[in-house]
Amino acid sequence: MKTIPLLFLLFIYFECDGKFIRHKDESFYECGQLIGYQQYCVDACQAHGSKEKGYCKGMAPFGLPGGCYCPKLPSNRVKMCFGALESKCA
């Protein structure tokens, strides 16, 4: 049972220099199957100031929200692009 927290800590360590942007219409479980989703991720991450190319990444094994992963952004947070936060998304 100690391996799960350790894996989670390693995951947090390696993902701490970016953030996720979730598509406002689709769940992250389906993002790899959507036509044009990879380009959406590239464009959305660029609009949020990412210096590197964004991509679709699921986090279902961790029970966490996922979607577009934007490397090396100034802040570490999950941004949900729907509901009350929709106006804050690119």
Swiss-Prot record:
Tissue: Expressed by the venom gland.
Signal peptide range: 1-18
LCN-type CS-alpha/beta domain: residues covered: 19-90
GO cellular component, one term: extracellular space
Record carries keyword Signal: yes
Protein localization: Secreted
Keywords: Disulfide bond, Ion channel impairing toxin, Neurotoxin, Secreted, Signal, Toxin, Voltage-gated sodium channel impairing toxin
Any one Pfam family match given in the protein's UniProt record, by short name: Toxin_3
Primary location recorded for the protein, binned into one broad class: secreted
Record-annotated disulphide pairs: 31-56, 41-68, 45-70, 81-89
Function per UniProt: Sodium channel (Nav) specific neurotoxin. Causes impairment of movement and mild paralysis in crickets at a dose of 0.5 ug per animal. A dose of 0.8 ug per cricket causes clear flaccid paralysis. A dose of 1.0 ug per cricket causes death within 2 hours. Is not toxic to mice at a dose of 100 ug per 20 g mouse weight.
Annotated family: Belongs to the long (4 C-C) scorpion toxin superfamily. Sodium channel inhibitor family.
The record's note on its domains: Has the structural arrangement of an alpha-helix connected to antiparallel beta-sheets by disulfide bonds (CS-alpha/beta).
The protein, known as: Phaiodotoxin
UniProt organism field: Anuroctonus phaiodactylus
Gene, per the UniProt record: phtx
